[in-house]
Swiss-Prot record:
GO MF annotation list: metalloendopeptidase inhibitor activity; zinc ion binding
Keywords tagged on the record: Disulfide bond, Extracellular matrix, Glycoprotein, Metal-binding, Metalloenzyme inhibitor, Metalloprotease inhibitor, Protease inhibitor, Secreted, Signal, Zinc
Protein name: Metalloproteinase inhibitor 3
Binding-site residues for Zn(2+), renumbered to this chain: 24
Location, primary (coarse class): secreted
Species whose genome carries this gene: Equus caballus (Horse)
Taxonomic classification: Eukaryota, Metazoa, Chordata, Craniata, Vertebrata
Family the entry assigns: Belongs to the protease inhibitor I35 (TIMP) family.
Amino acid sequence: MTPWLGLVVLLGSWSLGDWGAEACTCSPSHPQDAFCNSDIVIRAKVVGKKLVKEGPFGTLVYTIKQMKMYRGFTKMPHVQYIHTEASESLCGLKLEVNKYQYLLTGRVYDGKMYTGLCNFVERWDQLTLSQRKGLNYRYHLGCNCKIKSCYYLPCYVTSKNECLWTDMLSNFGYPGYQSKHYACIRQKGGYCSWYRGWAPPDKSIINATDP
């Protein structure tokens, strides 16, 4: 499962009632951006699913057992169902029932939580310790910062609230070291920079450790 969040590009055509979608393409997003741009962020286990006849291919409705909520307390304090397209070509998400705990992110529409391949969704046991700590408090602290993607050199930050995200330049690709181990947080002096550490950042921090 690929934890992406961003632009969805559906390649296909719709004619005479037939939907010819062929692919789902998403732009990469740092987990912190995925967190800050989501209405709902929860840890949950899927306990059931059913196919509902909505749209050209239907909608999968997963029944979940919510373990913990990280974001969305005012939007939907308790989530029991999540909705996704039944077709993966439309960015529908396939989850295992009664097998894993997942980190789930998504948006709320008409009182329902929706998610898909372009959202940050990952098995809980696949998250790094830094990512788990980010969910608890660090990502929230960085929601006023901007993570700037770098695909080709040279890349520069253009304002003090930016962190340069260079995972895509690595031979290892995405998700890379910054995605797995760093959060972009506002530091002393009002500048945003990459942070990694075991204690939450506070006023005593002068310089962040850069990747």
